[in-house]
């Protein structure tokens, strides 16, 4: 993959350790222990940066009795993602904000996260880094068909923007306008790429991929993807959850509809609007966590870290975010594992969203503590 071309297009300067890692690293470059050392160093550095430069976050830490130096990553104060529905957290001056991104708002009030240029560039780097889990192509060897808008028409909706960034890495055709899929254009582009001898990558939310499959079946159309078609999904089923398929059913539908050689050609991605990094699945459909992100599962009642392999409330510390402190507790229940062997590193499995009042109440109390401090309650 010619990521340097994309880097030049966006005037990205990889000048620090984390930028070298994001823009020039590969997932299998380090042992598990080396990755853990990288994570510790980078996340602690990010914590000190935000502690010194973000008054809101520093006062929150002081309220919890945590100073600027931490020995253990688990000591770094985290806050619930619901904070972003209540206020804008900024470590930089307002005039350094490149864009303010919103969530899709499927569950009510939208989150708003302000990002500077470097944070956005690092997000692009995480997409490039994650594509290495899928395969290794130069930009002249693959073309993409995106069931979504380009980044100029994503209307600042985070998921749409993230999915559109691939156009900076590979030639990309966009076949959705205002959430309307042009099925014929999608298939025409896929056939054009196939005839050129290049690898095809179809990307989009799972519901849109599902609708394309339904259209093809209704029209009696087929596509022989063989080993030359990859399908990357992201964003979940959202408001179409009532039509969702479980993963095995979804994979089977895609393998049959597109005549794929293996389910390994189907990959999901994970990202949420408050997180500045995109996680890609490997060949075993495990979401790999890059070394600049610390992921853990917390006990929903005590918010204490759980042993690897146990399900709990997902928490992330993302060192790539410059414009805001990305030290989060989410509304997801998931499992964090450490992997050795051929693919060393940390993986996450998202099981479900939080449903019980007790779990949400814990996040609410943290939000109230954060906002109370901002109102002068020190």
Swiss-Prot record:
Protein keywords: ATP-binding, Ligase, Luminescence, Nucleotide-binding
Signal peptide: none
Pathway info: Lipid metabolism; fatty acid reduction for biolumincescence
Domain of life: Bacteria
GO function terms (MF aspect): ATP binding; long-chain fatty acid--protein ligase activity
Gene Ontology biological process terms, A to Z: bioluminescence
Enzyme kind, highest EC tier: ligase
Catalytic reaction annotation: a long-chain fatty acid + L-cysteinyl-[protein] + ATP = an S-(long-chain fatty acyl)-L-cysteinyl-[protein] + AMP + diphosphate
EC number: 6.2.1.19
Function: Acyl-protein synthetase activates tetradecanoic acid. It is a component of the fatty acid reductase complex responsible for converting tetradecanoic acid to the aldehyde which serves as substrate in the luciferase-catalyzed reaction.
Family: Belongs to the LuxE family.
Descriptive protein name: Long-chain-fatty-acid--luciferin-component ligase
Gene (name only): luxE
């Amino acid at each position: 993959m010619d990521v340097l071309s994309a880097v030049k297009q966006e005037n990205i300067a990889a000048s620090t350790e984390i930028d070298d890692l994001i823009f020039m690293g590969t997932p299998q470059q380090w042992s598990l222990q080396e990755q853990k050392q990288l994570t510790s160093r980078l996340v602690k550095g990010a914590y000190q940066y935000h502690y010194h430069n973000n008054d809101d976050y520093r006062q929150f830490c002081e309220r919890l009795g945590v100073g600027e130096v931490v020995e253990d990553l688990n000591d770094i104060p985290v806050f619930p993602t619901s904070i972003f529905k209540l206020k804008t957290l900024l470590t930089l001056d307002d005039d350094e904000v490149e864009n303010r991104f919103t969530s899709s708002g499927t569950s009510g009030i939208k989150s708003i996260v302000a990002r500077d240029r470097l944070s956005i560039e690092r997000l692009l780097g995480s997409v490039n880094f994650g594509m290495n889990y899928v395969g290794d192509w130069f930009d002249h060897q693959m073309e993409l068909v995106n069931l979504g808008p380009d980044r100029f028409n994503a209307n600042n909706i985070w998921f749409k923007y993230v999915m559109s960034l691939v156009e900076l890495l590979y030639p990309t055709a966009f076949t959705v306008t205002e959430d309307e899929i042009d099925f014929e254009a999608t298939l025409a582009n896929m056939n054009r790429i196939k005839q050129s001898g290049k690898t095809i990558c179809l990307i989009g939310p799972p519901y849109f991929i599902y609708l394309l499959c339904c259209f093809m079946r209704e029209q009696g159309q087929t596509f022989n993807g063989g080993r030359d078609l990859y399908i990357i999904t992201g964003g979940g089923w959202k408001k179409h959850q009532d039509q969702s398929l479980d993963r095995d059913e979804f994979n089977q539908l895609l393998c049959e509809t597109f005549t794929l050689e293996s389910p390994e050609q189907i990959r999901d991605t994970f990202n949420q609007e408050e997180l500045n990094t995109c996680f890609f699945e490997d060949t075993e459909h495990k979401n790999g966590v890059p070394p600049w992100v610390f992921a853990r599962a917390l006990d929903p009642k005590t918010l204490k870290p759980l042993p690897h392999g146990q399900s709990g409330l997902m928490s992330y510390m993302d060192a790539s975010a410059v414009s805001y402190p990305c030290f989060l507790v989410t509304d997801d229940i998931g499992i964090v594992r450490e992997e050795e062997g051929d693919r060393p590193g940390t993986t996450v499995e998202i099981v479900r969203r939080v449903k019980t009042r007790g779990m949400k109440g814990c996040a609410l109390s943290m939000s109230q503590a954060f906002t109370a401090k901002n109102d002068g309650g020190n």
